[in-house]
Amino acid sequence: MSAFTPASEVLLRHSDDFEQSRILFAGDLQDDLPARLDTAASRAHTQQFHHWQVLSRQMGDNARFSLVATADDVADCDTLIYYWPKNKPEAQFQLMNLLSLLPVGTDIFVVGENRSGVRSAEQMLADYAPLNKVDSARRCGLYFGRLEKQPVFDANKFWGEYSVDGLTVKTLPGVFSRDGLDVGSQLLLSTLTPHTKGKVLDVGCGAGVLSVAFARHSPKIRLTLCDVSAPAVEASRATLATNGVEGEVFASNVFSEVKGRFDMIISNPPFHDGMQTSLDAAQTLIRGAVRHLNSGGELRIVANAFLPYPDVLDETFGFHEVIAQTGRFKVYRAIMTRQAKKG
């Protein structure tokens, strides 16, 4: 997060306008401009744990991570700079939350890549902070308005759910596969053996569907789930509770907050971070797994078939197996042996 995103580069064209402002940065914060822009005061709120990690190192307590922002998170701010995400329901959740807390008269800036659908911000905020486009560059749009009316925000209204083979999956905006089980996860689930025992870690757990499906036919497993996304953490907790499954769920940047070793690590790792394609998380997952697997333990992941994971698996574990595949996806399995690098 050292190079600025195109959206931040557009904002920097207007940096003089922000020098006297007390700014709250929120949304898809993929760089450290909130810590570096010259302002009267800066705060940041994010639902992404890895973004918070970077910003908190430079901003301390002025960078906050949570599902729902509170009045304390926006205190004394007179300007909102919101980075539009690729997911419109996610933007609506975050903006309605923030605008319900900020005082009438707050300056509102919305910036984002055109391909992310940022222009729909105009319609979304029409009743609260009518926006006008004030700049267009780097295939991004920058919109400005002033908060005229606070929306009423109720986080409970954003919950959704769907069923998978009799299990109820709870979801929130911004959670992967919010509207149904994705094909990759289906393929990974098909490979999980009933009556498995031991400690299982689900990395990038999303809504928790892999874990609850696994626990249904292997009730003796002890589950730990983690994700970088605050909505995913809350959705997984709700999914586990709804289905009567026990497990520990917490925010973590891959293994950053994970303690101990496990008998199995399962994952459908992301390769998109916001609008940017990124393989970093999956490579960190593979290389770091050896520090969190017991001897004889296994890493089992599903990935798009075109992604270059076999080389990283072989480099780390000494070998790998493909135990299921379709035209688009492969399920990889690697075992912790003495050949594996100890990280």
From Swiss-Prot:
Keywords: Cytoplasm, Methyltransferase, rRNA processing, S-adenosyl-L-methionine, Transferase. Its EC number is 2.1.1.172. Belongs to the methyltransferase superfamily. RsmC family. This is Ribosomal RNA small subunit methyltransferase C. Gene3D superfamilies: Vaccinia Virus protein VP39. One of its GO terms (molecular function) is 16S rRNA (guanine(1207)-N(2))-methyltransferase activity. PANTHER family: RIBOSOMAL RNA SMALL SUBUNIT METHYLTRANSFERASE C (PTHR47816:SF4). It catalyses: guanosine(1207) in 16S rRNA + S-adenosyl-L-methionine = N(2)-methylguanosine(1207) in 16S rRNA + S-adenosyl-L-homocysteine + H(+). Disulfide bonds: none annotated. Specifically methylates the guanine in position 1207 of 16S rRNA in the 30S particle. GO terms for cellular component: cytoplasm. The gene is rsmC. Monomer. It is found in: Cytoplasm. The keyword Zinc does not apply. Its main location: cytoplasm.
